[in-house]
């Protein structure tokens, strides 16, 4: 009975070991003006401004590369808020090496709900990306 108990404890403690992530300085993040703010049309054919309104980033060593966890806040602004609507949002994030060659990419497409009476709607979306040493990250919406 004691042997069984010790074996169970061994498996519990062995499976609880964790690997500590080593934080590191995040690489340069660029959002070109033409890709950071755009006008799109909703399902009801009304113009909606979309813009990047904040980015939180956390970076960790991942071998020779850097793992970047991002939270990107997209703000939608419309003038006509008399009815519920949806607006298409496409977010792309790309890491490039020092020669500007694509290294990794993450994209997310969704329809953002705009509640009747709400002129401004924010939504945060999370991403995970690998960045090579000496590389940078490009962020844009379309």
What are these regions (language model features)?
Residues 17-20:
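Bacterial signal peptide processing site
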Residues 106-135:
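Short, solvent-exposed, Trp/other aromatic-anchored flexible loops in extracytoplasmic proteins
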Residues 12-15:
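C-terminal motif of bacterial Sec signal peptides marking the signal peptidase cleavage site
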Residues 25-63:
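Transition segment at domain starts
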Residues 46-49, 56-69, 78-85, 130:
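Short, solvent-exposed beta-strand/turn "edge" segments of beta-rich domains on protein surfaces
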Residues 1-8:
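Sec-dependent signal peptide recognition
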Residues 67-73, 90, 138:
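One-face residue pattern on beta-strands with alternating periodicity enriched for small/polar residues
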Residues 87-100, 141:
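Extended low-complexity, serine/threonine- and proline-enriched intrinsically disordered segments
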